[in-house]
Amino acid sequence: MSLMKVLAIDLGASSGRVMQAVYNGSSLQLSEVHRFKNEPVNLNDGLYWNLLHLFGEIKQGIKKASNDSIPIRSISVDTWGVDYAYLDHNGDLLYQPHCYRDNRMGRYEESFYQLISKNELFKKTGVQPATYNTILQIYSDLQEKPQLKEVVQRVLFIPDLINYLLAGVLANEYTIASTSGLLDVFTQDFSEEIFEKLGIPTKWFSSPVKNGSVLRDLSPRIVQELKVEPFKVIAGAGHDTAAAVLAIPYENEKGTVFISCGTWSLVGIESDKPIITDEAFESGLTNEGCFDGKYRLLQNTTGMWIIQELQRDWRSQGEEVSFAEMVQLAEKVTDNQTWIYPNDPVFASPGDMESKIKEFCKVTGQAVPQTKGHIVRIVIESLALTYLETIEQLEDLTKQEMTTVQMVGGGIQNKLLCQITANFTNRLVITGPVEASALGNILSQLFTLEVIHSRQEAQNLIKASEVVTRYEPQAVEEFSNIQQKFKQIKKGISSC
């Protein structure tokens, strides 16, 4: 067959890329076309994403990708979850989208949960209640700006918004909508009952698009501006984790836990049915949507965010420390006896991450790290301990032994994290691909275009295109003591 090019806009919470994959009928050749920063902007009234900047960068990437003779067949977008934008009756953006790390939701949590309890919300939506969830964000917006009910015509999640800017079609895609806390977990459609209870207009959303959909060709205005040939804009796997899971080259899906490791780490399994038991709720697990309509039962845990913030801290102090250098420094620390709980709210907000880690260690009665290497080692080991905690919860809930961990995403470039995860979980860890979200985005387009037709075909394509690495577990001396101390640290902070 002739070569075919497919583009993926892959936006993370710290950077964005336009990627291209050239498909030759048996494998994919993935390459980065354009990379750019994505950082929220602090304004007087909150924290916002600079969507206009991002869209300008996306157009640059499309232009660069068109500079050879291989025709572009389609493009799709995947992003982080929960965030969204308001459009008015003219289809115009009302204001830049809020960032999920904005603090406005804290002012309205109490009144929100008086209307619907956390347990009821979980049972209806399958989504673990969290401050950053779309449902609480929108409720908070309506408390502060009740006039939104009069001026807003549609609400689009971030990938939906970019698709709209590219093609002019208003659509809500299923996988990204499944992160919102607004869908009925069984019907996989927006819950009228919840909307009515919270006073959210149902007209703001449309029934989610599932299993991929061709929206329209790239808008004539952009075609003319960029001087490119028209190609299809597809609503594929809009949520980056759903995309990443689609690209996992399972050796055996049964008995395998996935970890999608980026700014966040998503630790979970694929399931034919949602699990909304009290045990799942109390364990902090959530049910999100897969591209093929299945469910991702997972825990949203902190990922490389703390490492990224440490790097930002040190850069602001005039010290440029690369991620590779951070790992090298951490590898030299072999006698660590200090850990943090990465999911503690203190680590969720940006800034002063080194000070937060030291203060946490002090408050919990542990040795306070004095070197960069020790700080990074603490973070890496603590992430692996958090992964183990979730794996054991998944085993308890499903009554199924999890023998293998498949890690994907940018975080797997941290080989120390991968090996420590194997050691601490005492399980085989298989890593790859690094660019799982982009590849899953590509695969969702190939499904939509009917180029591929099954998950097995998709997995074979990834195996033919990407390299995977295996990490065998190595014994850790007195690991039961380490695990027990970590549990005590977590219990101690929860009782504070």
Residue ranges and their predicted role:
Residues 53-66, 187-193, 386-393:
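Short, well-ordered amphipathic alpha-helical segments that serve as non-catalytic structural scaffolds
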Residues 71-79, 154, 207, 400-409:
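Short glycine-rich phosphate-binding loop at a beta-alpha junction
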Residues 1-95, 223-233, 425-427, 496:
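N-terminal glycine/serine-rich phosphate-binding loop of ATP-dependent small-molecule kinases
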Residues 7-8, 20, 113-125, 139-157, ...:
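Active-site core segments that coordinate phosphate-bearing ligands/cofactors
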Residues 168-176:
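Enzymes and membrane/adaptor proteins characterized by extended Gly/Ser/Thr/Asp/Glu-rich
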Residues 63-133:
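Active-site phosphate-binding/coordination module
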Residues 35, 39, 98-105, 263-265, ...:
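Short, acidic/turn-prone active-site loops that include or flank metal/cofactor-
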